From Swiss-Prot:
Keywords: Ribonucleoprotein. HAMAP family: Lsm_RuxX. Residues 4-76 form the Sm domain. GO terms for molecular function: RNA binding. One of its GO terms (cellular component) is Sm-like protein family complex. InterPro entries: Lsm6/sSmF (IPR016487), LSM_dom_sf (IPR010920), Sm (IPR047575), Sm_dom_euk/arc (IPR001163), snRNP_Sm-like_arc (IPR022901). GO terms for biological process: mRNA splicing, via spliceosome. This is Putative snRNP Sm-like protein. It comes from the Archaea. Signal peptide: none annotated. PROSITE patterns: SM (PS52002).
Amino acid sequence: MAERPLDVIHKSLDKEVLVILKRGAEYRGKLIGYDIHLNVVLADAQLIENGEPKKSYGKIVIRGDNVLAISPVEIE
């Protein structure tokens, strides 16, 4: 049986994710919360530009309307 999108997000709780926004901004951090509207809460969030951290934040909330994609980050 195929996984549903929210199942993948749920499995990513307390793990590092990359959130890509509609206007192209990217944030990486530990996913500590989400809801059915894809509002997400990241801890230890970083704004990513050109693949590199540009600015660090503590905890941030990203409104689901702005989210284009949420991807688990593979830690090597």
